[in-house]
């Protein structure tokens, strides 16, 4: 929506409620929740088949947190409410605007919430945003007053009559909530969890299936919140100070594509002696445009990258041998989350298994598998709509179209109903061949330690010593437990045994004792977690309720 077309809020200084859709999420219900589609990024689509070894955590609604940080209006945020909690909030507090963020599979939840708003607070304006905005006729179907497609900070500032070009203030966000694996809660002390940093939104690569790229303008388009490396460095210093972190989860679709900004950040990190760790998203060909020395110096310690296949037609992979890229990164202590699409146009029943084997051969620390899905709002959706190959062109029943179960279109080669089987085979095969992610992470962390813990550059040496600090105890115990758990899987058991010997040789007696004693305790925890999962127990995020200072002042005055 262009600036001139942005409406203005009806009342001066409105009270605003920002909210995510209601839970519970990891169950099958009438509002489109699905047990197969929990509110957990990793367990949903990355470590789905790893059982007790799956990484479990929740991520806050970062977009809503960014919005409320960058407007001047009394506001509250209700994140992960139950339906009862959302209803109670509408009955308890008077709001002039209620803003809902949602994705297409949660359409029925957004619809229910809009009906409740009209029933309980009929004067409130309803604003809906997020990827749900790409659904056909979404404003009319929900009965919303406004649907925001694209960058929301500037839209909301215009909506409120405020300066849309004012500097962006980044909220203080820890990247994960309630992290656990193998039945053990992971550390939540200051510094244990990375800070979330959002420098840009959108991706100029413009892959036809990419909902994020389409949301922010498509090919060649993106929105920078921080144009320069200097601006980004100052924000990172603030996050470091306020959250006591040295690790940053950089939520930017292709962070390294903004080369001038990234290299200036590297200069400043060197000048100010910052040994930060960066978790980034990047494409293979962009990674290859940097030297490994630049990536290590920049603090890149984890990369999420696409591995779309040997014959991929996507530009972001052209000229890049992804196997070589992954091996090079891992040799320098950089972990990789590979992303593979199941059901590309060229996939057939005859070559699908080979495509999966190619993906698995990368042996990335984590591996996301997703179905090729024409999401509403993307060029791929429009292509299939024109061809008449969409299963549900109006997206009237999209609760099961979330990338983990079924196609939204008729595939030219794969019979309908087989896609979910192929997807699960990919997850299972990756786990069977490469073992749990914790084993792979330990191997790469050890490589980084061995290469850089004695580096001449003090800044780099400090980072790798920090990142490898858990190798002699925590990682060693996990590797011991993995070896025992996978006794019947010769390949994984052998890898665990070899890695354990490497760790013991590197760290000596402390590691030998900790790996055995800690490993036995951890194996018992893994068995308990296995039993918990067998009972069908699921994980749900806690509800967060946060209020701005001026919202609290108004409540006190009233």
Each predicted region: which residue ranges?
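Conserved beta-strand positions
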Residues: 18, 100, 128, 250-252, ...
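Flexible glycine/acidic-rich beta-alpha junction loops that bind and position SAM and/or redox cofactors
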Residues: 25-28, 134-138, 218, 260, ...
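Acidic, low-complexity intrinsically disordered segments
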Residues: 2-244
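A structural motif corresponding to the C-terminal end of an alpha-helix
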Residues: 67-76, 242-243, 272, 328-336, ...
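Radical SAM enzyme core and accessory elements
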Residues: 1-41, 91-96, 402-558
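Structural recognition of alpha->loop->beta junctions
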Residues: 139-158, 292, 297-303, 354-369
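Radical SAM [4Fe-4S] cluster-binding motif and immediate context
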Residues: 179-337, 342-344, 350-357
